[in-house]
């Protein structure tokens, strides 16, 4: 039998897509903050044309994670993971942490000019 979906994959996909969406702007700033320098840092904007695709993927993945976590729970058999209230509360907490990180990553390119 297959394991029931719990939203973990959608949370991971949303977080990864948000990181990729802000990689063109966040990457050079992180490298400069770590002490790296050079003209090659300007080439890290290669992902900029794909930013809208990554933003869309992040939002779609978060929607599916939200739907999987907050929709009415299916009947769980005793002893299954979905029957444990602490697990559901943990998934909700992780969802909101990832959602906040996605919003920070998506908004970072707009506040980045204030750091340079």
UniProtKB/Swiss-Prot annotation:
Cellular compartment(s): Cell inner membrane
Single GO MF annotation: mercury ion transmembrane transporter activity
UniProt keyword terms in alphabetical order: Cell inner membrane, Cell membrane, Membrane, Mercuric resistance, Mercury, Metal-binding, Plasmid, Transmembrane, Transmembrane helix, Transport
Gene Ontology CC annotations of this record: plasma membrane
Location, primary (coarse class): membrane
Transmembrane parts of this sequence: 16-36, 46-66, 94-114
Keyword Cell inner membrane: yes
One Pfam family per UniProt: MerT
Residues annotated to bind Hg(2+): 24-25, 76, 82
Protein transport in keyword set: no
Lipid bilayer topology: Multi-pass membrane protein
Family, per entry: Belongs to the MerT family.
Reported function: Involved in mercury resistance. Probably transfers a mercuric ion from the periplasmic Hg(2+)-binding protein MerP to the cytoplasmic mercuric reductase MerA.
Name used for this protein in its record: Mercuric transport protein MerT
Organism of provenance: Alcaligenes sp
């Amino acid at each position: 039998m297959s394991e029931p979906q719990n939203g973990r994959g959608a949370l991971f996909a949303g977080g990864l897509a948000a990181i990729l969406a802000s990689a063109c702007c966040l990457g050079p700033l992180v490298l400069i903050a770590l002490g790296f320098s050079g003209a090659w840092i300007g080439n890290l904007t290669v992902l900029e044309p794909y930013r809208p695709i990554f933003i869309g993927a992040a939002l779609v993945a978060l929607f599916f994670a939200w739907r999987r976590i907050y929709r009415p729970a299916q009947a769980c058999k005793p002893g299954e993971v979905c029957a444990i209230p602490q697990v559901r509360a943990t998934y909700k907490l992780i969802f909101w942490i990832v959602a906040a990180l996605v919003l920070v990553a998506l908004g970072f390119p707009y506040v980045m000019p204030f750091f340079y």
